[in-house]
Amino acid sequence: MGAFDVVVLGGGTAGVHVATEVAGGGKAVALVEAGLIGGESPYLACLPSNSLLLSAARGTSWEDAVARRTDVTGGLDDSAALRRLSRAGVTVIRGTGRVTAPGAVEVTLAPGEESAPAGTVVPLAYTDLVLATGCEPVAPPIEGLSDIPAWTTAESLCSPDLPRRLIVLGGGPAGCELTQIYASFGSQVSLVEADQRLLPGEPAFAGEILAAALRRAGAEIYLGSRATKAERTPDGLTLALADGTRIDADRLLLASGRRPRLGGLGLDALGLDITPGMALPTTTRCEVVGAGGDGVRVWAAGDVTGTTHTHASRYQAGVVAANILGDARDADYSALPRCVFTIPSVFSVGIVPGAAEAAGDAGTEAADDSGTENGTGAETAAGPGNIAGTGNGLAAEAGERTRRMLRIARMPGEDQAQPGHQAPPAHPASGPGSSDGSPRLVTARASLGDTVRAQLGQDDLGCLELYADAESGVLAGAVAVGPDAASWMGEVTLAIRAKIPVTILADVVHAFPTYGEALETALRELAGTGASAVRPSTARHNAVMADQEEKGTGPLSEQDIETPEDDAIEQHQELIPDELSLIHI
């Protein structure tokens, strides 16, 4: 099939997005994928999961919910996606690729490739190689696991079966969503999580509220519980926990870990020595560290980099495409949303205390303990250099995620701590200290139950916390648990990314009656004069202004940050376009 400007290995969200964008820029592009074009998200993950959750919320029967799921996923038919790529000018090759040398790939054709019989090996040449092969499930080391009826998350989301008794192993996002799905449709669900709480990578209150909701749906939850042995029984299976508890079920659903899919890619031919389960190291421009040279470049996007979620994969793909096309662009991970689409849903973004607590050495421990634990719920690939679903689970992922964001959050000239500088009091607790130059977090909380919207719906189950950088006066992170939280927390993502001062955010008017009004309570607390107010330090603010002047965005004065006068708002409106010009999602 010859030479191409760009060869993309992997046809999931990241691979398809890169291929389409780069082909639109005039490059000759080949995309290599043996499975479904579009990856797991539209067929076996995000879309079928959300479809079933919505059907459950409407009180639909299981049979009708499965039929709707089939419609949403197109019956696992990717022909429409294939046609879109072809129209975009992308050459799609059904097969698996392996790097044989810098600039060279061999593709073993898979069934369904029309150009030649399956098994045929086709050589390709490239100038730019994009690794976007996603992630794969990791089976936990449980004695007898291979002898019992077990599902992966993907298998559970394409099966027509509704087990009478189901064990879900893993209390991360997918484990919680699947627990709610099957419990809502009548299964007796037991959720097993090795950590002491659900969603261990987020602040404790998020997992506690969600656990209460799942219990009300009928699920039984085992926290701090490690599965040790599985046995087949005449009517199903029995799962034994380390504390001696035994749980009977008809099927086990494994939602306890995934790892980057890098095996068999021939990365050693690029000079890369990748430890199994580890993510690819990349630069801020998503170029694979140590893999380029000799006139070729190697990029990575999506789960292979340890950056989770479909929207994060799409974002990285945009960064890769821009750089391939000559538009130099750095990725900014400071405001990537994380969502759990349960009822109530969980939304988080930026730096949060739960992740900050794990930022010390959890990532290193996770790498050392590869595959030694189970039931941790890290069903998505962990942060760069870590394995999801290990002993520290989502806490390890959160630790690396926080380290990455803390590096981004540091202002110019603040690589070293300022001796003697103390954080102001915080409520209810401050986040990471600044011995390494990272932000000091101040927390403000608001209950959704205090909003008229919640009272109208007779639903007081919800809470949000905002985390502000005490020195710069901008938001650093947020977590919200409540109905459809992702839909009304988007403004927080923008605020973190654009570094909008808290004092300006506190002056924003929210429609009545909405859950968004709860944001006003927390923002006014942060912008007020109490213990939770943020007070920008002169040193940090001067660094912010210097950085903005260098970028030509126009600095804000100290007075402007502390008092949202009209001229401050005017100056900040001038700042926003330049800041947001970096975002091309």
Model-derived features: where do they sit?
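Conserved small/polar residues in nucleotide/adenosyl-binding loops
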Residues: I583-I585
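Beta1-alpha1 glycine-rich phosphate/pyrophosphate-binding loop at the start
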Residues: F4-V6, G11-L76, I181-G201, S487
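Short hydrophobic core segments
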Residues: V7-L9, G97, P123-G134, V168-L169, ...
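N-terminal Rossmann-like dinucleotide/flavin-binding domain of flavoprotein oxidoreductases
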Residues: G2, E40-Y126, E202-T228, G354-A355, ...
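FAD-site-proximal beta/loop scaffold in flavoenzymes
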Residues: S146-R164, R246-I247, R251-I324, A396
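A Rossmann-like FAD-binding core segment of flavoenzymes
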Residues: T91-R94, R98-E113, L124, F185-T284, ...
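Rossmann-like dinucleotide-binding cores of NAD(P)H-dependent redox enzymes
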Residues: D71-D78, L157-C158, P163-I167, P173-P234, ...
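Flexible, glycine-rich terminal cap/loop adjacent to redox cofactors
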Residues: L9-G11, H17-G35, E40, L47, ...
